[in-house]
């Protein structure tokens, strides 16, 4: 039902402040789920299992991190038919993020700009929300996305990632390490060769220790930016293989404004997502696959607005795909369309 109604609701949602509409939608989605209306709002999607990173995904279409930063809406989002859901980014301590307004629509380009700044309630509250999720308890595939606090010096970033990994590890199907948001000062420096080597080495040591402690291996994925040249992609790919990282998510938002020049809000600071990032993110997927071969699976995200876009990510070398901005513009019908395009 929601698939048919969303195009009617969208003008009202788009008349609201973007962040207010975001929370309004999530709150009502969760409320409908709790009222037992899941069959009315949900997508029933046929099983199309994919095993990636050693994890069995019921279908290859997931929700990207950022929509549910605190893991508070997992059960409502699960009704939309995703094969997996990624929540976060979470940091060790609660932080408010950047001042509002910090999210902007560019409807002429099917795009969003955000400078949220990892606003979240901290990792302890995050874990409590994850533990309360019925969908997770019933075996849903849940990725937990971790980052660093804004006031943590970049030289001590590893400490924040290790702190979060320690706490989320027992509750995750996989853990994503976000080093590519443009909205935390200097964060993308961690994509540099020496910084990345240090971080990945520390994380792999911790992963092995935690696997021994919990008697369960939880894969690690790295989320990278689209604004990378061939040498940078090569260096990152080599590091992923060398450190035996389990997966890579390509990509985060872009700082480029080339595709939206002259549009309202185009010069707002932050990361641009949506249709304009499709080509850049797909280029990174293809280039990464060329570097890592079959050693590291790629999850493709960025600008997926239809089944053909999802298929293009897979053809470029992705094993799974994730949605975010396309979901805002197209609604939950996009999940079903992408799953159908990738089936078989």
Swiss-Prot record:
Which keywords fit this entry according to its UniProt record?
Answer: Cell membrane, Flavoprotein, FMN, Membrane, Oxidoreductase, Pyrimidine biosynthesis
Kindly identify the residues recorded as the active site: 181 (nucleophile)
What SUPFAM superfamilies does this protein's entry cite? FMN-linked oxidoreductases (SSF51395)
Q: Which reaction does it catalyse?
A: (S)-dihydroorotate + a quinone = orotate + a quinol
Cofactor(s) annotated in UniProt: FMN
Residues involved in FMN binding: 65-69, 89, 145, 178, 223, 251, 274, 303, 324-325
Annotated metabolic or biological route of this protein? Pyrimidine metabolism; UMP biosynthesis via de novo pathway; orotate from (S)-dihydroorotate (quinone route): step 1/1
> What does the cofactor section's free text say about binding?
Binds 1 FMN per subunit.
| Domain of life (superkingdom) | Bacteria
**Name used for this protein in its record:** Dihydroorotate dehydrogenase (quinone)
| Source organism per UniProt | Cupriavidus taiwanensis (strain DSM 17343 / BCRC 17206 / CCUG 44338 / CIP 107171 / LMG 19424 / R1)
Q: What is the lineage of its organism?
A: Bacteria, Pseudomonadati, Pseudomonadota, Betaproteobacteria, Burkholderiales
